[in-house]
Amino acid sequence: MTNPKEKTPMCLVNELARFNRIQPQYKLLDERGPAHSKLFTVQLTLGEQTWQAESTSIKKAQHAAASLALSETTLPKPAARQTKNHMNNNPEAAELHGNTFTSSRHSAKGSITPTVELNGLAMRRGEPAIYRSLDPKPLPNQRANYNYRGMYHQRYLCPMLKTFYVQLTVGNSEFYGEGKTRQAARHNAALKALHALRNEPIPERSSLNGEANRGPEEDKDANKSEISLVFEISLKRNLSLSFEVIKESGPPHMKSFVTRVTVGEFTAEGEGNSKKLAKRRAAAAVLQELRKLPPLPVIEKPRIYIKRRPKNIIKASPEYGQGMNPISRLAQIQQAKKEKEPEYVLLSERGIQRRREFVMQVKVGEETATGTGPNKKTAKRNAAEAMLLQLGYKASSPVVEKTGKRGENPDWDEQNSGIADQTSTPKGILHLSPDVYQEMEASRNKTVPAPAISYLSSKEMNQASSSFFSTSVSQSCTAAIARELLTNGTSPTAEAIGFTGKNLMCHSSTVQPSKQLEYLAGIQGLQVNYSDRQSGNDFLTCLTLSPVQMTFHGIGSSLEASHDQAALSALKQFSEQGLDSVDGSLMAENGPFEQAKLRGEKADNKQANSGTIAQDCKDSKAVV
């Protein structure tokens, strides 16, 4: 349908059905073809007649069937409605139009008056339509008719109808209209303007904006508007620039603006149906004058060297740039354990604007550690370093205070000279360091089971205390003593070795784990330190064994219970150090429940064979 007001075939079929008092019926008969190109077959029934049509959609098939029904039906059709020949139901307007507007145009255009149509055409052309009323023509002088009897008798002198005249201006063209009313005169003038301007081409915007006939040297400014070019020229030549709307006229729906632009000594005006268009035309007019000015001399400006302010952020020690990054190392350790990677959380920011201090927290399983630094990166690094120490690993790199410039401290230079530069790796890829790789291989060969309740794995225990155990009682003896203390409360192995220390004497039936740990520490020559703090109704204990720098944690409702839990974790850690590879592999295959069961059986068997273990421990001590 070219005209949206034209009725569709289905609408005409409905009118035909209402006229004959029947009900039309559409039925979908078939649907075939692929999903992207289906064909639908629709059947239309009107009374006893049927028609079929197919198309690519159901609606199109219905319209096709309705078109067939309209052309082939034998039912009587209703009479067509007559179209209105009067515009806006105004007989005067229809009389003014004469034969210009046919009935078909009325049906297509509806109630569009000539003035409205002319306003649309004028807006497309960018020219305002301005109406101005004119004074009527003077009437001829008529003398009164007096009869011979001396009496005034008026014959056939009825008052003449008044005629209105209107002047219409569209751009540079003027048109005149007349009518019995002022509105009829406006319509008459608009009709004349439509006849004259309808076939004329619409002027191009390039000629309106003053963009035609540009030279090749202006091609570089093709994407810039005239207003931008005027601003650039005024800035380069140090000229004052101002835009001012000096006139505003016309009706509210078709206003006309006049804008004046002043650039130094040059002035120009522009007119348009919007302030933007008037401003652009004024800029285009003054731009023609500015381009006639002589070119500016080329002046090479000297380069300005800006001295950068020194950074007031104190950098961390250069030792942190060497060796293994603690963040990467902690991530590698968690990957080797096949556990969840560390989680970093920013807790707080302290300090003034230029002396910030960030507090970062890292969480590995149930362990947490914090680190501070002047920036988030350093705080994250310190938190990872603290977590490594808390897990029982050595520090990634020693923190050395920088006391002077490079070259002033020979010890610092010699220490850094032996460290190779760290190679850059792609983001997201962590290569295993040699020490972590060796630990993984050693743990695979030994197949030592992980502790059930502890903060240090057996692999970490080997790394932290291997040097100490090599000069004291062997690891198997230490594990045997710890198992005996956990099982019986006393250690026949320690007595067989000949340890003359503090005896485990307690009036109660059981010995506290803290006392047992002190007894074992006396055998090993370790120092036990407790660090306590209270959180609500619970007590938190941090147990440290030196000089091996092992840390265990405990929590309890009382200070004594918290100490006992931390000591119990340490004893369990020591008790799992001496298991042989066969038992370890068996435990790894059976799982946690079987490990606990096997551990109880081993404890009973080890008690019976304490004499043999004691003899082995004596031999190992003698060798040392």
Curated annotation (Swiss-Prot):
InterPro entries: DRBM-containing_protein, dsRBD_dom, STAU2_DSRM_1, STAU2_DSRM_2, STAU2_DSRM_3, STAU2_DSRM_4, Staufen_C. Residues 214-223, 596-605 have a biased composition (Basic and acidic residues). Residues 197-223, 401-428, 592-624 are annotated as: Disordered. SUPFAM superfamilies: dsRNA-binding domain-like. One of its GO terms (cellular component) is microtubule. PROSITE patterns: DS_RBD. RNA-binding protein required for the microtubule-dependent transport of RNAs within polarized cell types. This is Double-stranded RNA-binding protein Staufen homolog 2.
